[in-house]
Structure formats: structure tokens, C-alpha cells
């Protein structure tokens, strides 16, 4: 469901009161907008801020009374709808306003409006058929697919073990791609005296209703014909490669523009957050759990700003933690009620994985059967082992060319898959393969 702001509570309030923002911030936001764009009318300001026109009119009238703006030359006969420009007093105040932040896009929403708005959004569960089909292409059976789908329907945390490193992204995209519909988020929120920008054009794909606008991605300067500072987006899929870093759990501060940028977990609001190799840094993973995953059980996330202030925001997102095993993620395991192990492969699934991975070599059935049988005999019929064995043969073919020597290399590929190379002849030295 696409949300329209202001919230139900605020729609009953007149004019500026509907924004539930400090008057000083609204005044300075107007001055910053005029600084960037030059003279604008209340109608143009309302379109730029994505607020009702009566709000923009009230702001301008208030600022006229304070001597901060005046009608632009040749516009005095238009009374309340004239374009206005900053006076000398306004020019002096905008310099101070830009010391606090340079943000001059859509009007930020208050923390309360953000909470009420997110609560009003109904998220549809993933489509079971779509999810089964997408994961089936990765030789993940329906039971495991349904377990992932069940967790996603509750926006819960899942520990996924046994995935090969190079297929973690494919699993995440399969789950994220099965999340139907769209969600909404404000361009920015104002809390703790600071602006936090939520919309990120690199992470958020516009829904059809907003994508029709050519200026949709210009979050600093866009003009719109809607009275809502919320934007409709497809349900986001946000991924973190190489585990969690300290910068992934707290908002980044733009020193030049002087506002905060939403951290990846908050960008994933209403969608999917996936952490690849989550066990790479257990300490930072524990911090993700402390600020987002554990509070997320109550539908809350924690944003820490530079002042040390703690801002609690509404948060819910399906989270996939990919790790080698459940013990490797340490204390963060308490945040993951769902655990799906996709390591083991049936004989048919093993052949399917090998056939897909070796597709560039157009391998014959004999090679696939030979390799699958050798892996099974070695007790290495897992996703990671299959990926390593296939990688070995692909590397060999790239080096020596695709000839008749691949069958002879199966034994070495299996040894490599098990994490050990064949023992070199006595007295010989050979480099270790990473």
C-alpha cells in the first residue's frame, strides 16, 4: 500500500501545524530553498516541498511579516501568490541556516509522522510460486524455499548456512525478488535537531507512479505535483558484502551537505537486508544485532547520531545472514529465530549444480556423473565443495584450454574441493593454492 503523508492525525491540524516541525527549521528550510532556486511562488514552493499549497502560503506570509522575504520585482500585484525573494535580513539568516544543513529538498517529516506512516503500510508476503521457482534454479528444494518465505512474510531474521560464497547474492536476489508490491518512505526525516535523508537513488527503485517523473531522482531540487513528502518505491534489496563494518550500522554524516544519510539497515525498510559472509567480523555483526536486529523484534531500529543521542525509528525488514555455520556468528545468533542450512545436496541437485556451474565448458554427461560420483564418494557432496570443484575445472580449462584432460583432473578437483591439494612428489615443492 502506498502511503500518503501527512499522517491521519496531522491532517486534522491546520496549515503549518500539520508538519509537526519546529518553526525555526521550517523558516530556514524556506530560505535554503530560495537560496538554491531563486524567487519562487507559494505554489512552486509547495510542489518542491511536496506539501499542500496552504502550508507554503502560510510559511511565506509568516516570513513576510518577519521581514525575511518580499515580493519579487514585477510580482507585487499577485498578492499572496507572488514569487518572493529574500530580503537583506533573509540573506543574512540563510548564511546561518546553511551552517546547520544544506538540505533543501522535499520537506522532511517529523519522527512522529514517520512512525505513524510506517505503521500504516501493509507489506504483502512473498509469492510462494515465484520464490520456489527462483530458488529452484539454484537447486534449493521447496522445503527450504518455504522456510525462507515464511521468515520473509514475518520480516524476520534468517541465518542461512551452507551457501557457496558466489551464490549468496543469487539467493538474496531470489528472496528479494519474490517480495511483491511496493512500499513508501519519506525523502527525509527531522529528529534530534538534524536531517536524516532516507531516499537513496542507488538503493531505491521508484515505483511506476513516481518513475514517470523525469526529475524523480533529484532529491535536492525536485518539483512535484503531489502534496506528499513520501515517495513510492519497490521493496528494496540492500546487500552488505564481506560482513558488517562499523559504518554499516550508524548513519553517515555528509560533512559538506551537513545532513545524515540513512545506514543500510534503514535503507532496507520494508524490504530485504542481506549480509554476505556475516561471520567475517562477529563484533560488528553483534553491533548490527544490538541496534537493529534485536530491537527489530519490536518493530524498532536505533539510529545513533554524532551528538550521542539515540533516535528510535520504526523498522522492519527481512534479514538474511549468510555464514559458514551457526556458531560463527556468535552473540548475533540470538537475533535469528530461523535457521536454514542449504549445504547438503541430493544426487540430482548435485548434478544440477555442477551442470549449471560448468555450463561454459559444455561438459558431457560423463564428466558430470564422474565428478558428482567422486564428490559423493569423498563425502563432499555439498554446495561449497561443488562450487570449489567446478571452479578448479574452469580455471584449468581457462589455463590449458578445453581439451580431453578434464576427466583426468577430477581427482585433483575433488581434493581441491575438500580444501587440500594432492600431495606433491617427495622432494618437490609446489605453491599453496589460495
Q: Model-flagged regions — what are they?
A:
Residues 3-29:
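Short alpha-helical segments that sit at the start of domains
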Residues 27-34, 87, 94:
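Hydrophobic residues on short alpha-helical segments
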Residues 36-48:
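Short acidic, hydrophobic short linear motifs in intrinsically disordered regions
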Residues 54-124:
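Interdomain "pre-motor" coupling segment immediately N-terminal to P-loop NTPase/helicase cores
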Residues 118-145:
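Dynamic helix-loop-helix/coil hinge segments at AAA+ ATPase domain boundaries and subdomain interfaces
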Residues 139-321:
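Conserved ASCE/P-loop NTPase catalytic core
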Residues 283-289, 315, 328-361:
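Conserved AAA+ ATPase core "coupling" helix
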Residues 359-434:
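C-terminal alpha-helical "lid" subdomain
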